[in-house]
């Protein structure tokens, strides 16, 4: 029942230099963020990565979960990491791997990636006993070529989501019209 198994990808050689982009995506969310917002944001990021690869470039994608023990922005920016800081980076797609949208979508758009996977890491590391409510969303240490920061607000319109993808592609110098 998986239509993706019927797709065969044909790779073609291109005569222009391929760029490799490192995308660091924070999956730190405030407890007030709805699952709908997480899913929409993940879909936007998946669309961006798909467009980069469609244009003939490569993407390395890293999920980042950074949390601070304290709520103030000073601590959430990583200024006093020895006071209470947990950060986990998971490479979910290496640049030389083909794009597997199902795996990418789970890691970037499914609330369980944070709530089950990352929270279980926090429990194993003892962080959940140290910080209240698993801590507060914080800024990643390593930001790559694109850093998609933690979320504190709600949904955006579909038009705004499309504009965001196009703006990010433009910042990277990725032109879809030549592909």
Placement of each model-derived feature along the sequence:
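Negatively charged sequence features
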Residues: 1-20
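Proteins with a high burden of low-complexity, intrinsically disordered sequence enriched in S/T/G/P/A and R
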Residues: 1-3, 37, 56
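MIDAS-like acidic motif and immediate structural context at the N-terminus
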Residues: 16-41
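Acidic, glycine-rich A-domain
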Residues: 29-35, 43, 50-179
């Amino acid at each position: 029942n998986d239509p993706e198994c019927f797709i065969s990808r044909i790779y073609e050689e291109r005569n222009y230099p391929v760029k490799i982009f490192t995308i660091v995506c924070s999956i730190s969310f405030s407890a007030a963020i709805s699952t709908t917002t997480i899913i929409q944001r993940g879909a936007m990021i998946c669309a961006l990565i798909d467009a980069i690869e469609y244009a003939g470039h490569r993407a390395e994608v890293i999920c980042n979960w950074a949390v601070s023990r304290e709520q103030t922005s000073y601590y959430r920016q990583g200024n006093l990491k020895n006071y209470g800081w947990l950060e986990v980076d998971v490479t979910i797609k290496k640049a030389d791997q083909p794009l597997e949208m199902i795996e990418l979508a789970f890691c970037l758009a499914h609330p369980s990636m944070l709530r089950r996977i990352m929270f279980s890491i926090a429990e194993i590391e003892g962080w959940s006993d140290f910080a209240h409510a698993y801590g507060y969303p914080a800024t990643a240490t390593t930001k790559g070529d694109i850093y998609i920061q933690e979320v504190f607000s709600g949904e955006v319109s579909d038009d705004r989501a499309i504009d965001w993808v196009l703006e990010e592609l433009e910042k990277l110098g990725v032109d879809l019209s030549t592909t």
